[in-house]
């Protein structure tokens, strides 16, 4: 209901309206000042992996509202869930047929003010984003000496480096959903299917990327314009069948594809004072297939039994990333930049991950409201990453460059065949890794009412976890890093109901933060020359978190839309994992280290009220204090005292909604939504390099939906009205 009222189109837009939650760059979730690694996402209660190796969480905007029944966000830990979260557990429940047959279709059209009907640049591309570009696999698999001969006989690349200009047209999208019930054998068979497609065009003009040391010295800087084309596809199928009166079994299939193609035009100066101009093209294709089966069975009035299992296959492909760099001469002319062979290149990267989950749990009821829960869970995750680079050796090649956009008159296959350009295929053991994780878990939990208005929930979870990464050093030596742990995770949750309107909650728990695969793997990744590099740390260890919450809430009995809550929380972080920033070769290098301890504490306030008929307002805000104590031998850190990486000191959400109903049941829903995220540290500086910070960000959105009848409605959505420079 809230998603409909506020015009929310996907899960990410809904989650970021919740108290204490914000979305950082690249869709990373920040909860109570804790970054992506401190939260977890499940689909219908089962873990779901992220296809993006940079993030632990699956991008939440991959789930369109048309496929979602509800979103449950829990910021306190319960023993029935995996223990690897201290921020939030976000469970996305996909739609099920509620017994009412329906079919609906929706279409949308839109665009961004600074993009629509403006010039839009893109590098040469063979297929649309519905298909994956690629390279003949035999050019990846063959021996190096064979490749050097084969490339002179056949061009393995289907694209060139030309940049084309067009006019940005409106964005189009659509969704379709339907459901139907049948009576089979005296039971109900339900089928639901939904899908959505959307595309987005976005431009960023006159942006600046600069690397500074703590003393203020500029190592390099680049101005750039960015042109991004993005496609999102999602599909859901759900088949359910009832057994007996209260039993049921079901199967759910979810598919999502997020594909983006970004062209960057960059100008600037590197660390060695070369004045440069660059064309970069980056394509990311993330796909997810998730299969789930589940069953629910009741045995008498006291016992019930749940079983479920899932298989997820995620793929992350970065096909044919291209970079072409020019150096500006004093007379303004251009020549190919040839500092080393890495300035002009192509890159192909593929990540494949498979995850299996099995879950069994049972509940025994005694008394009027008391319960005992028992359960066991198994999870196995396997990842494989491979990458190949093709460097263009341009030494001795001096073409006449008159147009930096159209380059196929000299960057062509003919010049490869005649020897003016030499292609070097680079495949090294250090540019690939394998990783895996296995968890065996069991839990017990009791919900007991010593008196009618006081709930005591006490749980204990045991997890045996093994996480490993196989990688290679720069010298090609095979290495294996393993984290093997046996842990107990207690959880205490108390609720005292003062009366029908007021209640108080208290929670305490211990949880774990495990490093992600990419954080553990010493694999160097860089999207563009002079841009930030990412390099994992094989020495990372698990971090542990001690969490405490105290919450008061009031819901008016005669109108639950009117509510007020205030929450105080504190977290002690033992060995928290921090994203650090160093420099190498003039470029920033982001890596990861365990700090000694950290603290996160804050106050959250939420207020919702129906001011008068059909007119509602809501405000929620958070004030957060975070601090990291660095190891005594951690002298590499530039600043000895600072807040947690990714934490904003304050967050505010506010909304006003007007929803009158007119004659013939026509209805208007109009909402104005405001959000501010305070400044935050993106990456921690070490070895004299300063912390990388993001300033406060303000956004204002307007959404209007007009329901003409039960079968037809119109929606207008305007986002980021403030258009703040970032």
Model-derived regions: residue spans:
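Gram-negative outer-membrane beta-barrel transporters
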Residues: 565-572, 591-681
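Transmembrane beta-barrel wall of Gram-negative outer-membrane proteins
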Residues: 157-264, 286-291, 299-300, 492
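Surface-exposed extracellular loop regions of Gram-negative outer-membrane beta-barrel proteins
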Residues: 46-47, 259-261, 315-317, 335, ...
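Signature of Gram-negative outer-membrane beta-barrel scaffolds
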Residues: 345, 349, 356, 365-500, ...
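Conserved C-terminal beta-signal and adjacent last beta-strands/turns
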Residues: 344-351, 361-363, 492, 506, ...
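Periplasmic N-terminal accessory/gating domains of Gram-negative outer-membrane beta-barrel systems
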Residues: 1-30, 45-79, 86
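Repeated loop/turn-to-beta-strand initiation elements of outer-membrane beta-barrel proteins
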Residues: 246-249, 302-305, 369-372, 453-456, ...
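Outer membrane beta-barrel strand-and-loop segments of large Gram-negative receptors
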Residues: 339, 351, 359, 402-408, ...
């Amino acid at each position: 209901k809230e998603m409909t009222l506020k015009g929310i189109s996907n899960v990410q837009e809904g989650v970021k309206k919740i108290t204490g939650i914000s979305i950082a760059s690249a869709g990373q979730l920040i909860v109570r000042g804790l970054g992506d690694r401190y939260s977890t996402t499940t689909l219908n209660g089962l873990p779901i992996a992220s296809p993006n190796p940079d993030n632990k969480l699956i991008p939440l905007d991959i789930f369109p509202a048309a496929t979602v029944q509800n979103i449950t966000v829990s910021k306190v830990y319960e023993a029935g869930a995996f223990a690897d979260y201290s921020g939030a557990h976000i469970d996305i429940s996909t739609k099920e047929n509620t017994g009412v047959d329906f079919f609906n279709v929706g279409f949308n059209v839109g665009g961004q003010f600074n993009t629509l009907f403006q010039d839009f640049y893109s590098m040469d591309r063979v297929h649309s984003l519905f298909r994956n570009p690629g390279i003949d696999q035999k050019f990846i698999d063959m021996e190096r000496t064979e490749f050097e001969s084969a490339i002179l006989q056949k061009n393995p690349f289907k694209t060139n480096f030309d940049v084309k200009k067009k006019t940005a047209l409106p964005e189009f999208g659509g969704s379709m959903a339907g459901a139907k019930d049948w009576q089979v054998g005296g039971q109900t068979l339900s089928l639901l299917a939904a899908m959505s497609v959307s595309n987005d065009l976005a431009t960023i003009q006159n942006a600046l990327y600069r690397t500074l040391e703590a003393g203020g010295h500029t190592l390099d800087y680049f101005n750039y314009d960015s042109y991004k084309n993005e496609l999102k596809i999602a599909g859901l199928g759900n088949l359910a069948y009832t057994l007996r009166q209260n039993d049921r079994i079901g199967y759910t299939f979810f598919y999502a594809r997020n594909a983006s193609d970004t062209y960057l035009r960059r100008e600037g100066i590197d660390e060695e004072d070369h004045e440069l101009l660059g064309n970069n093209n980056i394509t990311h294709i993330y796909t997810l297939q998730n299969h789930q089966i589940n069953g629910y069975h009741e045995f008498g009035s006291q016992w019930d039994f749940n079983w479920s299992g899932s298989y997820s296959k995620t793929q992350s492909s970065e096909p044919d990333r291209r970079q072409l760099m020019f150096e500006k001469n004093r007379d303004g002319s251009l020549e190919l930049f040839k500092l080393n062979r890495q300035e002009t290149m192509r890159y192909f990267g593929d990540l494949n991950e498979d995850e299996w989950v099995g879950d069994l749990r049972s509940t025994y009821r005694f008394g009027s409201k008391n319960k005992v829960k028992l359960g066991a869970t198994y999870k196995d995750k396997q990842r494989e990453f491979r990458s190949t680079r093709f460097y263009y050796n341009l030494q001795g090649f001096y073409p006449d460059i008159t147009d930096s956009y159209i380059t196929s008159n000299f960057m062509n296959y003919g010049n490869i065949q005649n020897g003016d350009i030499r292609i070097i295929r680079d495949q090294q053991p250090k540019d690939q890794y394998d990783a895996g994780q296995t968890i065996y878990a069991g839990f017990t939990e009791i919900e007991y009412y010593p008196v009618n208005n006081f709930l005591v929930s006490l749980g204990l979870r045991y997890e045996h976890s093994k996480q490993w990464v196989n990688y290679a050093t720069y010298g090609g030596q095979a290495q294996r890093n393993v984290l093997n742990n046996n842990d107990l995770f207690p959880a205490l949750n108390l609720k005292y109901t003062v009366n029908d309107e007021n209640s108080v909650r208290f929670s305490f728990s211990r949880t774990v933060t495990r490093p992600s695969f990419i954080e553990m793997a010493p694999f160097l990744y860089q999207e563009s020359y002079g841009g930030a590099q990412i390099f994992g740390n094989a020495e990372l260890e698990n971090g542990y978190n001690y969490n405490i919450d105290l919450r008061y809430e009031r819901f008016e009995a005669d109108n639950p839309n009117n509510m007020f809550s205030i929450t105080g929380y504190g977290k002690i972080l033992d060995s928290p994992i921090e994203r650090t920033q160093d420099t190498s070769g003039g470029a920033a290098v982001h890596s990861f280290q365990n700090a000694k301890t950290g603290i996160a504490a804050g106050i959250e306030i939420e207020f919702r009220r129906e001011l008068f008929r059909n007119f509602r307002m809501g405000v929620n805000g958070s004030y957060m204090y975070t601090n990291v104590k660095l190891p005594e031998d951690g002298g590499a850190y530039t600043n000895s005292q600072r807040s947690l990486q990714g934490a904003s000191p304050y967050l505010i959400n506010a909304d006003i909604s007007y929803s009158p109903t007119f004659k013939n049941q026509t209805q208007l829903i109009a909402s104005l939504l405001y959000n501010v995220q305070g400044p935050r540290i993106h990456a921690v500086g070490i070895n004299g390099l300063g912390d990388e910070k993001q300033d406060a960000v303000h956004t204002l959105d307007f959404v209007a939906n007009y329901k003409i009848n039960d079968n037809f409605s119109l929606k207008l959505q305007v986002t980021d009205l403030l258009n703040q420079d970032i």
